[in-house]
Amino acid sequence: MLKINFLTIFPKYFDCFLKESIIGKAIERKKISINVIDFREFSENKHKKVDDSVYGGGQGMLLQVQPIAKALKTLKGLKILVSPQGKLFNQEIAKEIVKNHSEITFVSGRYEGFDERILNYIDIELSIGDYILTGGELPSMVMADSIIRLWEDVIKKESYENESFENNLLDYPQYTRPRVFEGFEVPEILLNGNHKEIEKWRKQKQIEKTKINRPDLYERFKNEK
């Protein structure tokens, strides 16, 4: 079973995530378990305060090391700090995590970030992109979703093997009914029943789309051919 812990001061953010179809079903089938932890409960301040002003001056409030460190000491497995300073998360990292870990903790921040000493209790810092969000809860859920999908028997293996980023290529174009909509038609090759030709067309479209939209992936694809 895969165990995922979310450390946050806003636990209600995760309510919908826990009920989402694939994740909710995986929980019901006992393929995964998810634990949302309010690290305010680990504060030694009588008012359960978890933030304070910045030494040396600066804007805003900083999350204190004490409550987060205390919470992390109760947990096992890989401990991830969700941070804009972190390594950029991608499909390869998701695969490595699934391969090597069965318990994962995401620490979500707020305000102006964390006391730097929190890094002494963390295994890796991860980011989902070069932009700033209000807090770490959304990135935590994004990364957890990606990891959960790869866990054994959560979804069929063939369902994700042909998705974007597998083999360093984006997904191919897909169509459903109606055959014609406002003058836009489904490519004829998809209707002729020739599966070899369809497979060849799809691979070509993957390459074309990747070259245009993600030249970095396209270069990796070329180098691995």
UniProtKB/Swiss-Prot annotation:
<dbReference type="InterPro" id="IPR023148">
    <property type="entry name" value="tRNA_m1G_MeTrfase_C_sf"/>
</dbReference>
<feature type="binding site">
    <location>
        <position position="109"/>
    </location>
    <ligand>
        <name>S-adenosyl-L-methionine</name>
    </ligand>
</feature>
<keyword id="KW-0963">Cytoplasm</keyword>
<dbReference type="InterPro" id="IPR029028">
    <property type="entry name" value="Alpha/beta_knot_MTases"/>
</dbReference>
<comment type="similarity">
    <text>Belongs to the RNA methyltransferase TrmD family.</text>
</comment>
<dbReference type="GO" id="GO:0002939">
    <property type="term" value="P:tRNA N1-guanine methylation"/>
</dbReference>
<keyword id="KW-0949">S-adenosyl-L-methionine</keyword>
<keyword id="KW-0819">tRNA processing</keyword>
<protein>
    <recommendedName>
        <fullName>tRNA (guanine-N(1)-)-methyltransferase</fullName>
        <ecNumber>2.1.1.228</ecNumber>
    </recommendedName>
</protein>
<keyword id="KW-0808">Transferase</keyword>
<feature type="binding site">
    <location>
        <begin position="128"/>
        <end position="133"/>
    </location>
    <ligand>
        <name>S-adenosyl-L-methionine</name>
    </ligand>
</feature>
<comment type="function">
    <text>Specifically methylates guanosine-37 in various tRNAs.</text>
</comment>
<dbReference type="GO" id="GO:0005829">
    <property type="term" value="C:cytosol"/>
</dbReference>
<dbReference type="InterPro" id="IPR002649">
    <property type="entry name" value="tRNA_m1G_MeTrfase_TrmD"/>
</dbReference>
<dbReference type="GO" id="GO:0052906">
    <property type="term" value="F:tRNA (guanine(37)-N1)-methyltransferase activity"/>
</dbReference>
<dbReference type="Pfam" id="PF01746">
    <property type="entry name" value="tRNA_m1G_MT"/>
</dbReference>
<keyword id="KW-0489">Methyltransferase</keyword>
<dbReference type="InterPro" id="IPR029026">
    <property type="entry name" value="tRNA_m1G_MTases_N"/>
</dbReference>
<comment type="subunit">
    <text>Homodimer.</text>
</comment>
<dbReference type="InterPro" id="IPR016009">
    <property type="entry name" value="tRNA_MeTrfase_TRMD/TRM10"/>
</dbReference>
